[in-house]
Each structure stands twice: as C-alpha cells, then as structure tokens.
Amino acid sequence: MQEYLSPAFYLTPPLDTRTPNIIYINPSDQRSNLELFTTLSHEGFPGHLYQTIFFGNTEPSDIRYLITSSGYIEGWATYIESYGYQYASNYLDDNDGSDYVCLTWLNRSINLCIYSLLDIGIHYYGWSQDEAARLLKLFGITNTNAISEIYQYIVETPANYLKYCWGYPVSYTHLTLPTT
C-alpha cells in the first residue's frame, strides 16, 4: 500500500476517545531532513495534531467534529509548515543554506499554486491533458510522463490542492489581521 499512500498524514482520532494521535510517515517516500522536519511541523506539532487536540480541549459540541472546513484545516497546517521552513533557516550558519531553505519553501508554494490552477482548469473549465500541459510548460515542466502523472492525479482528486493553496492565505490572514 505504500506506493498508493500520501507521503505523510495525521490520523484524526475517534470522536469519543480523542486518542490515539498517530502520524504516518510513508517509508517509501525518500525525504531529506528538511522535508521530514517540515512534514512533522505540518502533520504534528504545531500542525494537525496540535490543532485537533486544542480543538478537542475546547469541548465543542459533537456536531462541530462532523462539520469541518478542510480548507481551514489544511490552510493552518500549510501556514505552520511555512514556519517550519523559517525555523529551520534560522538555525543554519551559512547564507547558502538559508537561501536553499527559502527556495525550497517558495518551490513548494509555487507547486501548490500550479496544481490549484490545474485543478480549476481541469474540473471547472474541462481542460484536456494537452491543455494542462500548456500550463505546465510555462513552468518548465515538459516531460510527458510527469505531465500525465500530474494530470491523472488531479483528475482523481478534485479540489485536493485548493484546500492547501487557498486555505493557507485564509489562515494566515485570519491570524495576522489586527483586532479593533
């Protein structure tokens, strides 16, 4: 099953016990230390795991567990992941390492945006694989196997990347707006 699972995910605990809190890291997905650190930030503390425990400790009504906003949930975790990159960068002594970490986060952000644009194109405008390939070509992605794989994944998982890409600024704006 490893080849079909996400690189990592947090298993939300049952409503009646709130435990166990499990983070799964797919061993078939090779990760650098930086990617592992930011993944654990996203999935664990202070990402999904923290968000779930904090929410549970507010003792919400049961219906609030059933009605959720995946955009807000993934937006929060992506917001936290961005801080994971910044945190890692702060602990590097050399500028090249810090620049690499910054570039890695920017690349991740751009990929989320590209995949979200593809999702809108495919599922709203009905783009074919050739039309999706035109967008990918603008970003230097021309390998036909890669294009086919990206296209097929987005076809099979509608709106998956939108909750990360568009949920992130919603979470960020909510957390940074001054209160009056």
Segments the model singles out, each with a brief description of its role:
Residues Q30, L40, I67, G71, ...:
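Soluble non-cytosolic domains of exported or imported proteins
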Residues Q86-V155:
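Long, amphipathic alpha-helical stalk/connector segments used for oligomerization, subunit docking
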Residues E149-C165, P169:
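Active-site-proximal helix/loop microenvironment
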Residues T52-I53, I63-G97, Y115-L117:
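Post-HExxH zinc-binding segment in Zn-dependent metallohydrolases
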Residues H42, A77, G167:
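Hydrophobic, well-ordered secondary-structure elements that form the walls
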Residues E43-G47, I53-N57, D62-G71, I110, ...:
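Active/binding-pocket-proximal capping segment
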